[in-house]
Amino acid sequence: MSYPSQGHYLPPEHQYLTAATLASHGHEHLYAHSQLSDSPPRQDLAQRKRPKYTRSKTGCLTCRMKKIKCDETKPTCARCTHGQRECTWPDASSPRRRAPLRRGSIDDRPSTAGSSVSDDSSPSIRNSTPPRRFQMDSPESGLLPPPSARRNMDPFLQLPPVVAPESRHQHIRPRPPPFTPPQSEQHNLTLSPDPSEYCRYDRYDATYAQTHHLHSSHSSPSSRAPHMVTGIRGMGYSPESVHQWNSPPLLSPIESSSYQHYPLQERGMVGPSDNHHFRYQ
């Protein structure tokens, strides 16, 4: 029995690998062949494309309109001759015209400087004009502004001065002067009191006399008179002082008038006060 040689015998795994490698090598070979076959047309397309030209600012007007680069050959450039177009060039005198304009603008500056110098030299004339106006407005010249101008100027001339806040409070709240009654009123107070006070004192004296007479008639003067006096007059009065204020119920008109005026004069000399009225109420 004969066995195959080891060189020709391959296990199945190796056979599979070899097939895969052959297939991959075959695909690579085909891809490279396709690239080689496709490369010449691409190069032809790159050669066929027109070159990109930049815009020229110094070329002819026709190339500027077409936005192509001009070789600036005169009288006709190569682009215009190749495309059979009319080659037009801008006038050469236009830049020369711009230069005189610029020079003229520069030449105009000294004139403005001269005018500024003349303006600087004129302040003496300008400063001399306001005194003339004041002279015309002065009363000595006899020429016064019209009344409408005066009315417009009056509110500014007659404005009140600005007042500080402290002085404003002083203006708003002036301090009242000390009251000094005239001498005639003082004499009237001492000599002749107000007639309304006569009525008050008469009424109080009459009511007090009546109440004291009733109490003295019902009870003895030694037992109840001190209590009544302390209740009405206060703690500083005694029964002896009560008899000074008592008056008989029936008196002649002359005696009653003299009795009424005597205490009123003393009260007027002391001065009017409302404190002694509360004890009767």
Swiss-Prot record:
<keyword id="KW-0479">Metal-binding</keyword>
<dbReference type="GO" id="GO:0000981">
    <property type="term" value="F:DNA-binding transcription factor activity, RNA polymerase II-specific"/>
</dbReference>
<feature type="DNA-binding region" description="Zn(2)-C6 fungal-type">
    <location>
        <begin position="60"/>
        <end position="87"/>
    </location>
</feature>
<dbReference type="InterPro" id="IPR036864">
    <property type="entry name" value="Zn2-C6_fun-type_DNA-bd_sf"/>
</dbReference>
<dbReference type="InterPro" id="IPR001138">
    <property type="entry name" value="Zn2Cys6_DnaBD"/>
</dbReference>
<dbReference type="GO" id="GO:0000976">
    <property type="term" value="F:transcription cis-regulatory region binding"/>
</dbReference>
<dbReference type="GO" id="GO:0005634">
    <property type="term" value="C:nucleus"/>
</dbReference>
<keyword id="KW-0539">Nucleus</keyword>
<keyword id="KW-0238">DNA-binding</keyword>
<keyword id="KW-0805">Transcription regulation</keyword>
<dbReference type="GO" id="GO:0045944">
    <property type="term" value="P:positive regulation of transcription by RNA polymerase II"/>
</dbReference>
<dbReference type="Pfam" id="PF00172">
    <property type="entry name" value="Zn_clus"/>
</dbReference>
<keyword id="KW-0804">Transcription</keyword>
<comment type="function">
    <text>Transcription factor that acts as a negative regulator of basidioma development via repressing the expression of genes involved in basidioma development, including hydrophobins such as Hyd-1 and Hyd-8, lectins such as JRL1, as well as the fruiting body differentiation gene FVFD16.</text>
</comment>
<protein>
    <recommendedName>
        <fullName>Transcription factor lfc1</fullName>
    </recommendedName>
</protein>
<dbReference type="GO" id="GO:0008270">
    <property type="term" value="F:zinc ion binding"/>
</dbReference>
